[in-house]
Every structure is written in structure tokens, then in C-alpha cells.
């Protein structure tokens, strides 16, 4: 590496480090202080601006994704999510929608806009596993990870302004641009994984505060690993920015033992969750029938052998006389 490129790389590294927003780490481990402590990272993006940006992204998702229209399922998911939000450090409103997609996934946009795939609902055995996934996403929103990323990007853009006045032929120009194009994305990926770890850390506390068994969150990791074994690479894209699943399991188990006191009982599931899964299965079955052109049984009137009979005195065809048998059900081929 040339001297100019080394200096340029160090320059960009210093700017990146200087641009990393801190966090008011106030009683982060104190579950009893949830809702009063400060876990959000400092950012030059205001909450109002973050919500406005998130609304723009959400509008695009709503147009492009297949948003589930079932009011019963949507109401249930929203109720579970809002209960978790009330037992979290989130300072902005939470909006959650369900995407009709069989993949196991959930994600959060800036400003508290959240999406949950139907595949996550179907993969869960109990309500507490769904709560764990939602609580993780609330952890992202509460810590304002999106605002943190946008702050870094904004500062980096300003940091690159002086490059406009340096001739492109200068070695230092090429060195800075190489560092910017190669080093910055790697730094963002690294911190994104730290964000995921923090979201796990906070999410476990939120579901515990809401009365759920935090071990259910660890249990759902088993679902992810099973899916990966059944279909290698299927989860790689979804969890590319996450730490390895095995590491997340170990870290979560340690957190549960250290800062989450055992309770005599937890909310595991509800009969409503079973109803929701049954309703989802019905929708899936109906969708499969429709995709095959099978809409189920249809009514057809039985005709007489003599379809060429002459009109009767009442003006009807002989085959349509009042002596016909009642209609019968026949399945469409």
C-alpha cells in the first residue's frame, strides 16, 4: 500500500470513528427501569424526521409487497405488538403490518414502521415465539438504529465534500475513494451486527417485561436453524447482517441467566394464537386451490337423458320440468 493510500485510509477511518453516535447507556441492564431509561443512540436525525422518512419507505413497501388484508389476523398481531411496545423503551408510535409471504422474516423501517411475514406466524409453535421476533424488532426501533445509520451516512457525505477540490490525478484522491468504497460498507456491516446483538439484548428484556418466557426467543432460533438445514442458503439473505445463529443463542442464554430473574409463571400462548394459526392455514389452503384453478364444489342441475325434448305446455324444456331431481354437488375437475 502506498503512503498516500495509507494516509487516506487513516483519514476515512478517523472520520468514521468520529461519526459514530454514542448512546446514553442509562441502566441498560435494569429490567425494572424499562420505559424510563435511555437506550436510543444519539443522532442528528430528529424523531419527527425519522418518522417522516419511515413513512415514505412504508408507503413503498405497502405498494410493492402483498400486505395481508385479513382483519382478524392483523388485529391480533397488532395487539401483541402494542403490548410489547408498552413494555419497552420505545418513544415513538409503533405501526405493524403483516406481509403474506411464507418466508420466516420480520423487519423494521425508520420511525417505528414494522412488518412481519405470515411465514413467521406459521413457523412459531406458541405466541411467545412470535412475541420474541416482534420484541427484537422493537429493540431496533427503541435504540434508533436506523437514525444512527442515517447519521453516519450524512456525516460521511459531508466528510467527502473536500474531495471535490482535490484533482482526481492526485494519489490521495484515489486512496480516499478506495477507502470510502471498500472500507465504509464493511464498517456499516460490522456495526449492523452490533445493532442486531443489541436488538437481541433489548428484545429479550421487552418480552420478559410483557410476561413472556424469554427462552422462547432462543427456541425460535432452532426454527431458523431447522429451516436452514432443510433448505441450505434459504436464510442466508435474511440473516446476512446478523451474528451467527449459534452465537446469538449463547449470548441470549447468558443474558437470561444474568439479568432476567426467574418468574413462577410466564405467558406461553393463548387459545387465540391457535385460532390465528388455523385461520392462516385456511387462507393458505384456499390460495393453493385458487392457484390450481380449483375453487371447490359447485352446483350443477341434473339433466334428463332426452335433452332434445320439445317445450311443455308451461313453455319450459322437457328436461327442465318440475319432475327433475334436486341439484347435486359435483366437484369441478
Description of each model-found segment:
Residues 293-307, 318-333:
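Short acidic, low-complexity intrinsically disordered linear motifs used
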Residues 9-18:
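Bacterial N-terminal signal peptides
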Residues 313-317:
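Extended, charge-rich alpha-helical interface modules
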Residues 2, 24-32, 307-310, 326, ...:
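Long amphipathic alpha-helical segments used for membrane anchoring, targeting, substrate engagement
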Residues 1-10:
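Bacterial N-terminal signal peptides that target proteins for export
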Residues 20-284, 293:
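A Zn2+-metalloprotease active-site environment signal
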Residues 17-21, 91, 324, 329:
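Intrinsically disordered low-complexity regions specifically enriched for long asparagine
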Amino acid at each position: 500500500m502506498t503512503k498516500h493510500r495509507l494516509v487516506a485510509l487513516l483519514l476515512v477511518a478517523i472520520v468514521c470513528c468520529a461519526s459514530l453516535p454514542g448512546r446514553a447507556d442509562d441502566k441498560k441492564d435494569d429490567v425494572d427501569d424499562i420505559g424510563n431509561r435511555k437506550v436510543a443512540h444519539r443522532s442528528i436525525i430528529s424523531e419527527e424526521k425519522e418518522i417522516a422518512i419511515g413513512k415514505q419507505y412504508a408507503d413503498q413497501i405497502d405498494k410493492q409487497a402483498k400486505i395481508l388484508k385479513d382483519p382478524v389476523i392483523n388485529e391480533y398481531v397488532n395487539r401483541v405488538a402494542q403490548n410489547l411496545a408498552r413494555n419497552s423503551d420505545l418513544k415513538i408510535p409503533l405501526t405493524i403490518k403483516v406481509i403474506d409471504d411464507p418466508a420466516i422474516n420480520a423487519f423494521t423501517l425508520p420511525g417505528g414502521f414494522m412488518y412481519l411475514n405470515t411465514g413467521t406466524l406459521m413457523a412459531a409453535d406458541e405466541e411467545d415465539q412470535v412475541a420474541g421476533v416482534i420484541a427484537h424488532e422493537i429493540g431496533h426501533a427503541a435504540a434508533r438504529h436506523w437514525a444512527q445509520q442515517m447519521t453516519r451516512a450524512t456525516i460521511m457525505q459531508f466528510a467527502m465534500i473536500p474531495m471535490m477540490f482535490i484533482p482526481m490525478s492526485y494519489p490521495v484522491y484515489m486512496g480516499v475513494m478506495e477507502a470510502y468504497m471498500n472500507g465504509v460498507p464493511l464498517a456499516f456491516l460490522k456495526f449492523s451486527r452490533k445493532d442486531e446483538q443489541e436488538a437481541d439484548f433489548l428484545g429479550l428484556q421487552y418480552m420478559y417485561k410483557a410476561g413472556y418466557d424469554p427462552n422462547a426467543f432462543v427456541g425460535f432460533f432452532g426454527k431458523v436453524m431447522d429451516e436452514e438445514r432443510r433448505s441450505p442458503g434459504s436464510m442466508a439473505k435474511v440473516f446476512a447482517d446478523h451474528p451467527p445463529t449459534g452465537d446469538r443463542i449463547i449470548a441470549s442464554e447468558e443474558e437470561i441467566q444474568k439479568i432476567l430473574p426467574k418468574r413462577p409463571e410466564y405467558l406461553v400462548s393463548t387459545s387465540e394464537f391457535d385460532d390465528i394459526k388455523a385461520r392462516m392455514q385456511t387462507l393458505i389452503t384456499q390460495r393453493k386451490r385458487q392457484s390450481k384453478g380449483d375453487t371447490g364444489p359447485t352446483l350443477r342441475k341434473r339433466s334428463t337423458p332426452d335433452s332434445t325434448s320439445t317445450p311443455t305446455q308451461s313453455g319450459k324444456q322437457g328436461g327442465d320440468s318440475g319432475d327433475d331431481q334436486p341439484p347435486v354437488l359435483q366437484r369441478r375437475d
